Amino acid sequence: MGISLKKIGNKATYKEINVTGKFFRNMQVTHMTLKSARCELGAKKITEKQIADALARGKENPRTGLPGLGKVGAVTLSQDTVLMIFDPGIGPEGKKTTYKVQIKGNNSTGFSNLKWEPTIVGKSSARMGKATVALVLDLMKVYGMMKYYEPDNKVFPDDQTDFSGKVLTEYKTIIKEMMDARFVNFGPGVDVETAIINIRETFNIYRGQPWVASSKLQQIRFLYSLFKLSPQERSDFCTSLIFTAGKEGKRYGPYGKIF
């Protein structure tokens, strides 16, 4: 049996995974729920420190090839989306547990596809590990979510010209639909028009950070695919997502985890 060691704080927890019949039976009766989704679209300003750090590391704008990652004071966006998923305590953790799932690009300074990485609230120094992207996409196919989602970052806009016309209108509709349903928290004081303006400003290839805007569009698409599920399907998907990230289930071998 293997051992998985995760970065921990002062107190460690040991858990056996995929070892006993009871573990698998608990998995079968576990039904987690999505408690909240946050994808902030409020404007952030690129700071002098961010620019200086990027230049010191020799970073170039992946869209233009110019030195640095935007201009000081220009608009950008937060890089991630966060799901909060609640386990009522029947399942493998054996107690009530809340998971924070961070969704963001694989590359924080360039165009990339998304990754899904949960942590256990209260164990924030110990990440469960990234969910295998291919398995997440397989899950999405099972639930019919690929009708609304595209996993390849290359098909998304990478500048203000691409993010215009019908494409812009489509995202405006998607954001409004989720905002009206209060499915996603887009940040304090953010309405649909503000969200679209901030995304467009971030797509400025000379001043902004277009790879961040592109990642945000991917995240919005994922959220919309989740939004279009029934409440029961949504819960089932979130449950499977957590198990996939934790490599829990009969497709994986037995191991012990210290976190």
Segments the model singles out, each with a brief description of its role:
Residues M1-F259:
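Short, positively charged
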